[in-house]
Amino acid sequence: MEKNKKIDFSIGIFDDISENIKKRVKKEADNCEIYGVGVYSDEIVKNEYKTSPIRSEEERMNLVKNLEGVNFIFLVDSIDVNEIKKIVEKACKGVLKNRN
């Protein structure tokens, strides 16, 4: 990844985007140069959170991609920290490549 770029992200289910979520995302995005949002896959929500998402993962990704301050989105299909790190790094590389 490009040095000296502060990159931050949030991960969640994001079935509903409340005003509080919009404010939180904007605040977090304002404190970094590149901000991303990860959306848990339908499978992770069902198997790990023991619930069913209201919206499909595609619909949820469409909701978060238009939030103010979001530079990239990514699907999270693992709860393993090392796998999530790889997913985020891959998504960040795409954003950094497009910025240059």
What would you call each of these model-derived segments?
Residues 1-100:
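Nucleotidyltransferase catalytic core that binds NTPs
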